[in-house]
Amino acid sequence: MEKFRNAFIEFYELSKKYLENSTGQKVYEVNYDNDIDSFLTVFPILESKIGGDINCAMSDETVILAMQQVEFKMFTFWYMRSAANVKSMLNKITDKETKEQFIRIFKDMLVYAKVITSINNMYSNMKKDTNEIVQDLKKILGIVSLIKSANNEHQAYKILMENNSFIIRTINKVLADSNYIIKIIALFNTDVVSDKIKLEEYKDVFSFSKENVIFGIKCFCDITIDGIDQINNKYVSFFKKVLPNIILFQTSCVKTTQFVNIFSKLSSIVYSEILTNERLHVLFSEIMASFKTKVSVEDLKKRKVNNIQGLISEISNNREMYKNIFVEEYEKHKTTLISIVQCITDNYNINYKENAVDIEFIFDFIQEHYISKL
């Protein structure tokens, strides 16, 4: 909102000069809050009229088209005076540099208004969306439970196929929602649902675009794993059938077979290491022992933390405590954890674009750009 306000102040200062010079009339006293609200109110109509997507890459022609739709009389400083639109003022500017500056200012206003409108819409739908995520998560955990209780791969494959439509629909929904990560965070941090400023901060950090996802998929496909044979089982067969139905895979020009092969190898490595890696077992035991000194298991039982909704509620109600525990344990065991993961990466000859993977760099990047923002 602050960026939008600053852009509007620039717009007002430049407009004031040209309106007064061209009409000989003094502008009224400006009320920035009212004018900003007025602009945001008409923005959805304005967006529909210009027919183009409002973003940083839009052309000057699109910005000028938007100027034609905005009349000065809607603002307090020129309220109900002449019906001059913003483009008419642009036409009065003879200096090329000033004209380009005015177009840039109005473009910034449009882009920031788009962001604010998006945040307001997300804010309005947040509770409904988070409830839907919980229901999806319960369904996924139910499917996982059925697979774990299956006697063999054929039974597990049958369970997956029976839930094929739900899995495809859920993956498409997650990848199509640029704010999905924020909604996951909102499950554990209720401030996001009630605080638009916090929501705007999180949107800057955790939102993702379709282009981001496609780029991530392509980067993932640049991973090579030479230390393990190709995995061939019913689970791999299932996901080779599913991914061609995922919209972003259809538009990313990535071979789904290649993606599944890499993912199946990584999944197999993770599963195997969790079962057999002694250093991991020691690390997990130390973390759990430390956790039990900070959180009473009996108290958790009394608070009925026995399902996903109970866990979400527990973390949400005691967010600062759990955040502090996480930070403390991570700092205490960070060096050991990085060493373990780096050894696993090296043992399986996992490379990215034919170069060795630097696990410490990845951990530091995630901590600096994402975890520290929570």
Curated annotation (Swiss-Prot):
It comes from Fowlpox virus (strain NVSL) (FPV). The keyword Ion transport does not apply. This is Protein A6 homolog. Pfam families: Pox_A6 (PF04924). The keyword rRNA processing does not apply. Keywords: Virion. Plays an essential role in immature virion (IV) to mature virion (MV) transition. Belongs to the chordopoxvirinae A6 family. InterPro entries: Poxvirus_A6. It is found in: Virion. One of its GO terms (cellular component) is virion component.
